[in-house]
């Protein structure tokens, strides 16, 4: 029985693995001023691209701002796509499959009045 379970696990692992992916496209350009772009694609449906541009924010700060996307085919057969921007506001991914925060709820009027009252009548420290 144990050998059957081990054999079943081995067969499951072999069937679960995709064949080794082959890169069918790989483009990359690096410019002297710091900007770049790249794109890649493999034969198993994984692909991505990005473009980075050097951006001066003010006289003391500058950075490379990046915009890009990627996609892959999940084990469920669905294609998952993600786009993103990375700039002075941080990394900002967007995709249908990413979790979203709960909706904001308005503060009830009685709570707002209580907070206003407490602020107006609190002791100054």
Swiss-Prot record:
It comes from the Eukaryota. Disulfide bonds: none annotated. Residues 33-102 form the Chitin-binding type R&R domain. GO terms for cellular component: chitin-based extracellular matrix. GO terms for molecular function: structural constituent of chitin-based larval cuticle. Residues 1-16 form the signal peptide. Keywords: Cuticle, Signal. Component of the cuticle of the larva of tobacco hornworm. This is Larval cuticle protein LCP-14. The lineage of its organism: Eukaryota, Metazoa, Ecdysozoa, Arthropoda, Hexapoda.
């Amino acid at each position: 029985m144990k050998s059957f379970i081990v054999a079943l696990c081995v067969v499951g692992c072999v069937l679960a693995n995709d064949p080794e992916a082959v890169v069918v496209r790989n483009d990359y350009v690096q410019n002297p001023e710091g900007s770049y772009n790249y794109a890649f694609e493999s034969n198993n449906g994984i692909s991505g691209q990005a473009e980075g541009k050097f951006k001066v924010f003010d006289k003391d700060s500058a950075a490379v701002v990046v915009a890009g996307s990627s996609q892959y085919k999940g084990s469920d057969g669905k294609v998952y796509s993600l786009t993103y921007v990375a700039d002075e506001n941080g990394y900002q991914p967007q995709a249908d499959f990413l979790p979203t925060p709960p909706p904001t709820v308005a503060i009830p009027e009685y709570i707002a009045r209580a907070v206003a009252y407490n602020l107006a009548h609190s002791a100054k420290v």
